[in-house]
């Protein structure tokens, strides 16, 4: 599933193409995604100029004068920028095209768990949309601190890794990035969230930011389907300290990496480096 780094890589790849350009038309070939594509979306966007592309959590917010169209990549979704001249014929899983003058923005989603939605400007701030309003803070914002994590986890018995994944404290820390961040912070993923001290949460906040920044720099992680807007795979997964390295020696101390299951998801950690 594309997480924050993959969505941010997509945003950075798309925005230089679409910002300041007008949508000539929208071709919706499959309206039944995770939620139905709004029936009037194509007409609503015709001849509209894209003003900006923002990311909130794992959602992409494309602003036009009348509102925002919101895209979520789901588990297998991608957005590709394709030259209008000689654009490939849409394949089975190519569900939506936004046609501009010189290129096509194509949404592909084999499993159809993604979404394309509309938020009209008269409905108010897009960040108040029901899917966005309850999201945690952005990891690169000043609001994301060790003190925030410490305060929000007092009395909680859930594991620190599961608390990170929940998304109500901080957005975008998916499974691979939670394991990697906890390794960098030296925190064992099974530790109860409420038992982690403030200094250790301060290290964890720094580790989350560093891990996500490194992943973005490397084009995200391609475990199955993800490619960026230019069709290239990410390669962060090649440099992981612990993720998907069960039985291999820790890159720091040489201890074999362990794999366990938490909340039906695989967790990887070093039993020596993480306490």
From Swiss-Prot:
Any single Pfam family the record assigns to this protein: Fapy_DNA_glyco
PROSITE patterns: FPG_CAT, ZF_FPG_1, ZF_FPG_2
Zn finger region (FPG-type): 241-275
Active site (UniProt): 2 (schiff-base intermediate with dna), 3 (proton donor), 58 (proton donor), 265 (proton donor)
UniProt xrefs under CDD domains: EcFpg-like_N
Enzyme Commission number, as recorded: 3.2.2.23, 4.2.99.18
Function recorded in the entry: Involved in base excision repair of DNA damaged by oxidation or by mutagenic agents. Acts as a DNA glycosylase that recognizes and removes damaged bases. Has a preference for oxidized purines, such as 7,8-dihydro-8-oxoguanine (8-oxoG). Has AP (apurinic/apyrimidinic) lyase activity and introduces nicks in the DNA strand. Cleaves the DNA backbone by beta-delta elimination to generate a single-strand break at the site of the removed base with both 3'- and 5'-phosphates.
NCBIfam families in the record: fpg, PRK01103.1
HAMAP family for this protein: Fapy_DNA_glycosyl
Protein name: Formamidopyrimidine-DNA glycosylase
Phylogenetic lineage: Bacteria, Pseudomonadati, Pseudomonadota, Betaproteobacteria, Burkholderiales
